[in-house]
A protein has these predicted regions:
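N-terminal/edge-of-domain interface segments
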Residues: 1-131
Length: 131
């Protein structure tokens, strides 16, 4: 990613197209929440028009894993708007949704986090992938 360009999406109920292949068993996500842990329903739609809903959950990026989170990576500090480093460990978490492997994924609809938690809480998704 070039500097100062968007490198994540906010989970805000949007539909994201996924170019899947038949046989995938899981849909994986890398993400984290800010100002508290957050989660909600994520809907996977298959190319045959059927769908399934599962729960997606990410912990607060300034706290270690909890509630079944998996620490995908950690950083020893975060940058502040003033250009200084804040010496606090920051985290990105992994979560996954089990898929019907007899079908092909067409899209995923993200949770509407702002409707479920205080308006200060947000969930950032950095990557989505099939396995």
């Amino acid at each position: 990613m070039p500097s100062c360009q968007p490198d994540n999406i906010l989970a805000a109920g949007q539909k994201i197209l996924v170019h899947g292949t038949a046989g995938a068993t899981t849909l994986g996500f890398l993400g984290s929440s800010g100002n508290g842990s957050a989660g909600g329903p994520v809907t996977v739609t298959y190319t045959d028009g059927t769908s399934q809903t599962s729960q997606l959950y990410f912990g607060d990026w300034a706290q270690s894993a909890s509630n079944g989170d998996i620490n995908a990576l950690s950083m020893p500090y975060r940058n502040s708007q003033g250009g200084t480093n804040q010496q606090i460990t920051m985290y990105v978490f992994a979560d996954e949704v089990q898929l019907d492997s007899s079908k092909t994924v067409a899209s995923v609809t993200m949770p509407m986090i702002a409707d479920q938690i205080s308006s200060n809480t947000s969930t950032h998704i950095f990557a989505i992938g099939l396995k």
